[in-house]
Every structure is written in C-alpha cells, then in structure tokens.
C-alpha cells in the first residue's frame, strides 16, 4: 500500500483485515459457483443502436476528460426527479449522445451497457472478475423531453436489475463456457467466431457507463486522499464515475477525440443545476513524444524506403536497367510487411517475436 509506505510513522491499518478470507476464497470462479444448468436463461434480440462515428485514435492512445461535480447537488437533483444518481447520469449521457445523432439515423435507439457488480446478488470474496451487465436503450421522438428519458431509464433499471433477470443472464453467459462441444474446439478456430460474436453483440450498444459508487476509506487514510478517479480502455466511448466525500468524479475515455458528447453532457448537467468543473483534460504524458516502438517502426519504414530507392538507383546507373534491385525491393517490402503486421496487431515487437 502506497500510503503505508509513504507514512510508516502513522501505522496506518490494513485495508483488508479479514483473516477469515483465504487465498482460495479470493481466487474462486464465482461464475461457475452460482451457475445452474437447470435455471432459466435470458436470450432476447436487440435492435442495432446508433454507433459513434469519426476518426479513431491509435490503439495505444485514448482521449481523456475528467469532470468533478458535488455529490450533494447531483443527489438533490436526482432525488427531485425521483430517480437514483446512476439513473440520472445514465439519462444525461443518453441525452448528450442523442444531440450528436444525424437526422438520417434518428430512428435508431441510443443503447448503453451498464456493468453490474454481481456480488450485490451473489455473495463472493473472489478478487477475480465477477461482473455482469444490463443494457439500457432509448428511442427519441421530435417531442421527447428529458423527463421522458428519465422515466424510461428508471423503468428499465427496475426490470433489468431484478435478481431473476440477473441470474438468467449469468446462466446464459456461463452456459457457453460449459458447452462440451465448444470446449473441444481449438482456440485458434474459436477466436474468429468469438470476435464476430462480440462485434454482432455490440451492435446494440452505443457507449458504456460504469458507476463504481461510493468509495469508503478508513478515517486514518482520509486526510491523505483528495479524491478518486478511474478510467477504462474502450473502443468507442465509456464514462466511469465514483465518489469520495462530497466530490463525484466523472471520467470519460474515448477513441473519438472530438469532445462533443463530453461537452453536451457537461452542459446538460449545468442546465439541471449541477455545477461541473473540468479538472484535468491534459494528463501528464498525453502530449509527450511517441513511445519507442512507434519511433522504431517509423525509422524502420524510412530505412526500407531508402534501401529500395538507393538500390534501384545504383542498379540503373551501373547496368542501365532494373535487375537485381527488384529482388532487394521485394525483400525489403516483405520484411516491412511482416514487421508492420506485428506492430499493428500487438504494438510490441519483442512480444510479437515471443509469440512467433
């Protein structure tokens, strides 16, 4: 623990003092523990949702925006609307996305994936992943008001968060893993189909919103902590939120760095009498020079081009025609193609060599 190392004289308490929890408890597969082959499953078709468009950043890059709001203000506004904070922020995000929907796609719904902590439904001490999700989808009409979206989101939350629905989804998910036929298929064959299934399943999702909720720390730690924030990697747009004390941090991560949805979201909160402050939009290292692998790849590309040009020039000046230089050019191109595929797929040349 960093704070324990930084302040050894304070003798800060352990954050996980429960000695009754064993290593086996923390490593258990809670999905398999609560899976029942006889339980009902929940499968339903989802209509394709609006998808965010725009030029995306490179694989290793991410646009980051962090917004801080007072817990008291957002709680008061959500309470006045008769909804929870999570429902209110979900509706606000859907509203912000809708403002960017072009007219020719206005009939498509806005779909959000909301991760759900399954520990709230099934007791578990596991440190492994034990999360499910629900999908919230809203259609807009020309006269749709924000209150209509709030009402729709609230109703969907109440339906999707019932234990029966959550349990059915858990069984549906684990049943694929337990399928004896699929378990016999080699991973190399399954991978393309899994990727295709992920793509098809993601058609009903526009963005993701994950609310971690209230973070509580022992009193001895509180004076050393100003706030908490979290981000998640995404292929499109994801909003994460958490609160500590009287401050809630809303963290946007996006592959499409135009910032319009983030702007719309902040403006909507301000219209709802919730003050917002963008604390950080330029994190340390965000404008630093490119990482070494990117520089190395660019230098390698340049050298391949130089090699091909120089060899062709020498061949032409010496022999008066193109001969052996074509073989050098072809070899340089094949080498560049192999390295470029490795770089694009894994962004780590040494790791790719290990895989090969």
Q: What are these language model-derived features?
A:
Residues 288-303:
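Juxtamembrane interface helix immediately N-terminal to a transmembrane segment
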Residues 51-119, 248:
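Gly/Ser/Thr-rich phosphate-binding loops and adjoining beta-strand/alpha-helix segments
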Residues 306-312:
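Hydrophobic, membrane-inserted alpha-helices
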Residues 2-73, 269-287:
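Non-catalytic, low-complexity flexible loops and terminal extensions
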Residues 99-289:
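Acyl-thioester-dependent acyl-group transfer interface
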Residues 312-319:
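Juxtamembrane "helix-exit" motif on the non-cytosolic side of transmembrane helices
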Residues 320-332:
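Hydrophobic alpha-helical transmembrane segments
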Residues 334-353:
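Membrane-helix interfacial anchor on the cytosolic side
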């Amino acid at each position: 623990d960093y704070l324990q190392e930084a302040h050894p004289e304070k003798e800060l308490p352990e954050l996980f003092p429960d000695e009754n929890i064993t290593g086996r408890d923390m490593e258990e597969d809670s999905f398999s523990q609560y899976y029942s082959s006889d339980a009902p499953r929940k499968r339903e078709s989802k209509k394709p949702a609006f998808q965010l468009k725009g030029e995306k950043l490179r694989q290793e890059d991410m646009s980051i925006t962090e917004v801080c709001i007072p817990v008291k203000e957002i709680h008061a506004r959500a309470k006045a609307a008769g909804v929870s904070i999570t429902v209110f922020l979900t509706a606000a995000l859907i509203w912000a996305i809708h403002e960017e929907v072009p007219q020719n796609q206005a009939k498509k719904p806005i779909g959000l994936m909301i991760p759900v902590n399954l520990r709230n439904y099934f007791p578990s001490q596991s440190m492994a992943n034990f999360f499910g999700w629900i999908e919230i989808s809203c259609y807009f009409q020309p006269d749709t008001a924000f209150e209509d979206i709030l009402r729709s989101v609230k109703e969907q939350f109440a339906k999707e968060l019932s234990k029966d629905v959550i349990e059915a989804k858990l069984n549906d998910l684990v049943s694929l893993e337990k399928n004896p036929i699929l378990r016999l298929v080699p991973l190399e064959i399954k991978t393309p189909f899994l990727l295709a299934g992920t793509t098809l399943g993601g058609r009903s999702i526009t963005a993701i919103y994950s609310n971690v909720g209230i973070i509580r720390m022992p009193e001895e730690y509180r004076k050393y902590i100003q706030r908490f924030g979290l981000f998640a990697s995404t292929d499109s747009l994801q909003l994460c939120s958490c609160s500590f004390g009287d401050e809630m941090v809303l963290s946007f991560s996006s592959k499409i760095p135009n910032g319009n949805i983030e702007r719309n979201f902040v403006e909507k909160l301000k219209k709802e009498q919730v003050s917002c402050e963008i604390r950080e939009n330029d994190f340390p290292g965000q404008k630093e020079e490119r990482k070494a692998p990117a520089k190395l790849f660019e230098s390698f590309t340049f050298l391949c081009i130089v090699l091909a040009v120089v060899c062709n020039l020498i061949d032409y000046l010496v022999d008066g025609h193109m001969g052996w230089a074509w073989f050098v050019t072809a070899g340089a191109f094949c080498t560049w193609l192999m390295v470029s595929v490795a770089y694009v797929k894994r962004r780590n040349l040494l790791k790719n060599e290990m895989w090969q």
